[in-house]
Amino acid sequence: MTHIAVIDNHGQFTHLEQRALRDLGVDVELVDNTTSPEQLIQTADGLVLSGGPDIDRVGNCPEYLELDIPILGICLGMQLLANELGGSVAAGDYGGYADVDIEILDDTDPLIGSLAPETRVWASHADEVKSVPEGFERTARSDVCRIEAMSNRDQERYGVQWHPEVAHTERGEEVFKNFIARCQ
């Protein structure tokens, strides 16, 4: 059975990420972000870097990026991917929370391509990715956030700025199904 570790970055929706994966039949574990990478790699087939309030409270998450397993960053998790791998993160022009219509820019993307041409999502963030790291491509955009999603297919690193685990996100379950497929 596929085992995915959800890394707890103290986000308000982290338990929903765990529940969404569990409901899809995955062996899922909620793991504190101070857990050693060596311990994670023993059982995890993939990692979800949860959202959270502050990039200064991500524990060992930067070290997890060295692991040779697929990683999905959600909200703060996506910002962490960008920040640690050479992209940039800054305050967004809009911030806050809202239903947002996003445009899928790459219908072949393994994480969100199946959502093309557009979908409605729940966003809740003040900061956002301003430039993607080398090797990544921008895979979604909206009127309120230029980089709504990004991916590096070669390294199996994916990020979404929105929250697929929240009921307000249409087709959020599909995002998790697509990530599970990358972990199998």
UniProtKB/Swiss-Prot annotation:
Pathway: Purine metabolism; GMP biosynthesis; GMP from XMP (L-Gln route): step 1/1. Its EC number is 6.3.5.2. Residues 3-184 form the Glutamine amidotransferase type-1 domain. Gene3D superfamilies: 3.40.50.880. It catalyses: XMP + L-glutamine + ATP + H2O = GMP + L-glutamate + AMP + diphosphate + 2 H(+). Keywords: ATP-binding, Glutamine amidotransferase, GMP biosynthesis, Ligase, Nucleotide-binding, Purine biosynthesis. The keyword Transmembrane helix does not apply. Pfam families: GATase. One of its GO terms (cellular component) is cytosol. GO terms for molecular function: ATP binding; GMP synthase activity. InterPro entries: Class_I_gatase-like, GATASE, GMP_synth_GATase, GMP_synthase_A. The active site is at 75 (nucleophile), 163, 165. It comes from the Archaea. Catalyzes the synthesis of GMP from XMP. Heterodimer composed of a glutamine amidotransferase subunit (A) and a GMP-binding subunit (B). NCBIfam families: guaA_Nterm, PRK00758.1. This is GMP synthase [glutamine-hydrolyzing] subunit A. The gene is guaAA.
